[in-house]
Amino acid sequence: MLGIERLGLVDAFAQSSDYRALVCIFLNGGNDGGNMIIPYDDYASYAAAREPSGIAIPQSSLLRTGVVPSVGTEFGFHPSLTGLHTLWNEGKLAVACNVGTLVEPTTRDGYRNRTNRVPLNLFSHSDQINQWQTSISDSAGPSGWGGRTADKVADLNSTIFPPVTSTAGTPIFTTGNLERPLAIAVAPTRLDAALRLDGFPSPPDNDLRYVEMKRLLLLDQDKALVRGASRVTDEAIAMELALRSTGDPAVAPFPLNPRSTLGNQLEQIAKMISVRNELGMKRQIFFCSLGGFDTHNAQVIGGTPL
C-alpha cells in the first residue's frame, strides 16, 4: 500500500488497533518490470541485454536508490518514477524482486529441452493473470489467494459481511473455497448505494421492492437450483441493507484531478474501511486494478514507463 495517508486510509485504520486490511492493486499485465527497477552497479550486464533492442534506459538518467543494505548493491528507478522514488527515500516503499509465475527455477536450455517444468499455457496473457491471482502456476487453480486468505480470517469478523471485497468486478483473486466475494461500485457512487439491487433511489420504493423480492425468494424451494439462487440473492439483500445503513462517510479523495479510475476505487475502499466497526469487521481484503499496459512493438516508440 503506497501513500495511504493521502487517501484517508490512515485515519480509517486508526479506529481500532485490532483491525487489519490488505489492499491489492493489481496491474493488468504487460509492464516491463526490467525497465522499472534497474541494476545501477551492474549496469553493464543490463545494457548488454537491452541495448541491442534499443530499450535500455541510460544510466545517467536513473533515479538512484543508494546502496541497499540487504544486498550490498545499488539500483535505479526509471527516470519518470519520481513518485515511487520519493516514497523509497522516505522509507515507505519496498521492492520484491525476482518474483513471478515460474513453477521452478528455469534456464533457457532447460526450457528448450523441456527439462524444466513451466507454467501452464506459458505466454498466454489470460492464464498468466490467473496464475498471479491464484498463486498456482502449474494448473488452473479454482480459487485465488485473496479468497483463500479470507477463508482463514473470516471467523475473526462478527458479521456475515464478506471479508473480501472487489471494486473491479469478480476476479478469481477474490474467490475462496468457503467465502463468497463482494463486488461493489466505485466512487463517486455513494457507499450506501454501491450495492443497490433494484435501481430505485428513494427508500419507500426500495423497501416495497424488497418486500416483494423476499416473497419471490420463497417460491419453488423444492428445486435445488432455485433454492441455491434464492439463498445467494437473500444474502445479497442483507449485505445491501447493511451497507445502506452506514450512509456515505466522508474520506479524503484521491489527490488527482480529474478523477482517476484507480483513485475512484481506492476512495470507495477507504469508505468501506471507515465503516468497519458498523459492519463488524476485523479483517478485510480489498481488490482493485489498473491497466493493462501491453505496448507490443511500440515500447521503443512510446519511450515512457508503464
Locate predicted features.
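Feature for exported/extracytoplasmic and membrane-associated proteins, marking the mature portion
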Residues: 1-306
